[in-house]
């Protein structure tokens, strides 16, 4: 039996999406601690995964994500609404007791170049 109490979540941690009234972004911006990538959505091939793991494929690179609530990220990727993915910082592992849980979070983010 489902609870009748609606659970409140804070926004996803380490990814940002467009609002409903905004245009879709032209590219996906991936921010790592020491490097940044910009992948045009026109070169997007597919995304695959589940709640704790997502792979995003482009012709030259793969973006590998681990975390939780990533099924929400897959929905946003399918709609091309994701503007930015950020590598997690140490502070992201802590939150105040009175803060609502994020709907999902990226805990590890890796970009791999595809070798031909």
Feature annotation, model-predicted:
Residues 1-22:
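Anionic N-terminal interaction surfaces
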Residues 14, 65-116:
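Helix-rich interaction surfaces within compact, conserved domain-sized segments
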Residues 19-21, 36-37, 46:
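Short, conserved, surface-exposed binding loops centered on an aromatic residue
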Residues 21-26, 48-52:
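A short, compositionally biased
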Residues 24-38:
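Short aromatic-glycine motifs in intrinsically disordered, low-complexity regions
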Residues 40-50:
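Phosphoinositide-dependent membrane-docking surfaces
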Residues 45-47, 61-64, 71-72:
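Short, surface-exposed beta-strand-loop junctions and turns on beta-sheet-rich folds
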Residues 50-61:
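Short acidic, Gly/Pro-enriched loop/turn segments at secondary-structure junctions
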């Amino acid at each position: 039996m489902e609870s009748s109490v609606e659970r409140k979540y804070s926004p996803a941690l380490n990814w940002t999406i467009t609002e409903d009234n905004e245009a879709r972004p032209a590219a996906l911006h991936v921010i790592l601690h020491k490097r940044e990538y910009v992948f045009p959505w026109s070169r997007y091939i597919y995304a695959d995964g589940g709640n704790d793991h997502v792979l995003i494929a482009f012709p030259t690179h793969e973006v590998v994500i681990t975390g939780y609530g990533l099924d929400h990220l897959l929905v946003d990727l399918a709609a091309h609404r994701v503007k930015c993915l950020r590598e997690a910082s140490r502070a992201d592992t802590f939150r105040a007791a009175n803060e609502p849980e994020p709907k999902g979070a990226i805990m590890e983010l890796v970009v791999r170049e595809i070798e031909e």
